[in-house]
């Protein structure tokens, strides 16, 4: 059976057909509409899936935000242009006439990355560092979603009580500092207004402020990982997302994690499925993989 998998992120929407063998084909992308109106996201999803839906038997959606009863509830509305709520499953079933499921994108990615691990691993955590910071936790071989869908939203744990206000309403969240949006928001002077991609480019060219911003992000993530190790005693942490997979970033995180006491060290791995982990994880869950 073929699954039409959809990944809704803060920057882009992706869709692909995924067979029972896990092979991805006909992958497509569109920019995520920066709009508070549900109609804008519905129209973008319609354009994304219409060329693919005739070739699928079901739909699996991985989306940023809390997924509860098939709907998206934005914990940080800024990541979706201010959109607060969207009925994912209902909308995709209306658009495609196919049975649909929805799950948080980082939770889905965690499940895909867990399947790719070698060795006797039962406990792992996936972290995505992109427009925002999200996560997924596998404990005892089971994916944790939580009764309200909040499990794994580690980007909204405290990093700095005197830090910037996060879009979720808290002050000093990891996401407000370490994410691509957080990196860009802290830029000053000639870097003010630059996006994270530009800041990474400038850092590679030797720009001191750009390098400091990226180090600040990596140091914040390393401290988060130490906290995660203390909380879950996971066997490894897998890092993905556009920032997490940027050249040289994971090495910085490893450097800062090494400065923590040894009890909080844990193996760090780059995401095996790169930017397709959310799509694949959603498809796996739609195929009936047990949580």
Swiss-Prot record:
| Highest taxon listed in the record's lineage | Bacteria
Give, as in the UniProt entry, the pathway in which the protein acts: Amino-sugar metabolism; N-acetylneuraminate degradation; D-fructose 6-phosphate from N-acetylneuraminate: step 2/5
Coiled coil location: none
Give the binding site residues for Zn(2+).
156, 166, 168, 173
Q: Cite the Pfam families for this sequence.
A: ROK
> What's the catalysed reaction?
an N-acyl-D-mannosamine + ATP = an N-acyl-D-mannosamine 6-phosphate + ADP + H(+)
Q: State the top-level EC class.
A: transferase
User: What's a Gene Ontology MF term here?
Assistant: zinc ion binding
Which is a GO BP term held by this UniProt record?
A: N-acetylneuraminate catabolic process
Q: Which UniProt keywords apply?
A: ATP-binding, Carbohydrate metabolism, Kinase, Metal-binding, Nucleotide-binding, Transferase, Zinc
Report the EC code(s) recorded for this entry.
2.7.1.60
Q: Where is the signal peptide?
A: none
- Sequence positions that bind ATP: 5-12, 132-139
Instruction: Quote the Gene3D superfamilies the UniProt record gives.
Output: 3.30.420.40
Family recorded in the similarity comment? Belongs to the ROK (NagC/XylR) family. NanK subfamily.
Subunit: Homodimer.
Please describe what this protein does: Catalyzes the phosphorylation of N-acetylmannosamine (ManNAc) to ManNAc-6-P.
Q: Which HAMAP family match?
A: ManNAc_kinase
Q: What is this protein called?
A: N-acetylmannosamine kinase
């Amino acid at each position: 059976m073929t699954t039409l998998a959809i990944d809704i992120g803060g920057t882009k929407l992706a869709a692909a057909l995924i067979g029972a063998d896990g092979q991805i084909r006909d992958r497509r992308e569109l920019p995520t509409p920066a709009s508070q109106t549900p109609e804008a996201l519905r129209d973008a999803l319609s354009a994304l899936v219409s060329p693919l839906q005739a070739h699928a038997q079901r739909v699996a959606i991985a989306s940023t935000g809390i997924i509860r009863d098939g709907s998206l509830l934005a914990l940080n509305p800024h990541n979706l242009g201010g959109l607060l709520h969207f009925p994912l499953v209902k909308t995709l079933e209306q658009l495609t006439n196919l049975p649909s499921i929805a799950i948080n994108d980082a939770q889905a990615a965690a499940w895909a990355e867990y399947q790719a691990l070698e060795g006797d691993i039962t406990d792992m955590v996936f972290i995505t560092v992109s427009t925002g910071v999200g996560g997924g936790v596998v404990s005892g071989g089971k994916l944790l979603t939580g009764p309200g869908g909040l499990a794994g939203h580690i980007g909204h744990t405290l990093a700095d009580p005197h830090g910037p206000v996060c879009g979720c309403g808290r002050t000093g969240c990891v996401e407000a500092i370490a994410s691509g949006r957080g990196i860009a928001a802290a830029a000053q002077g000639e870097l003010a207004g630059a996006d994270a991609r530009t800041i990474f480019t400038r850092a590679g060219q030797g720009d001191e402020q750009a390098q400091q911003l990226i180090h600040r992000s990596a140091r914040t993530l390393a401290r988060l990982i130490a906290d995660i190790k203390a909380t879950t005693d996971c066997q490894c942490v897998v890092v993905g997302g556009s920032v997490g997979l940027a050249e040289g970033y994971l090495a910085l995180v490893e450097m800062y994690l090494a400065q923590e006491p040894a009890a909080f060290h844990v193996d760090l791995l780059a995401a095996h499925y790169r930017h397709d982990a959310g799509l694949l994880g959603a498809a796996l869950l739609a195929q009936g993989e047990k949580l």
